[in-house]
Amino acid sequence: MSTVKITTTLGDIVVSLYDETPLHRDNFLKLAAEGYYDGLLFHRVIKDFMVQGGDPDSKGAPAGKRLGMGGPGYAVKAEINARLFHKRGALCAARLGDEVNPGRESSGSQFYIVWGSVYKPAQLKQMEKQMQQNQVTIAFNDLVAAHKDEIMDMRR
């Protein structure tokens, strides 16, 4: 896992980049090394949820300019991983919604950092276990529903 320090006028933010998403990790590291993010704004801030940055159009943008559509001219192939969910402190790739982006590709440069709720690592681990158990339960219930008649015959 790689870490990156984002220096802002309000202090530093250290984020982790997962090895399980190598295309996104390598792209972010490349852009950071090139200085792509230097001087860019966090152009979207939603209180108690997230901040978004990475739009090159935000560099030197006048107040009131609509931001959020700029990028390096390419997208990053989706690397969806159910284990990596949007928990507090997570660095996430921004993307357009599924209805206009069925491939679920990410912006080439825009990202957001989730603030949301504060959880202890043990709480996050328990939530992950519960989600996995829920998936097993759903699969089991689907099988039971599909074979209900056979199961009832076996019980007789």
Identify the role of each PLM range:
Residues M1-R156:
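Cyclophilin-like peptidyl-prolyl cis-trans isomerases
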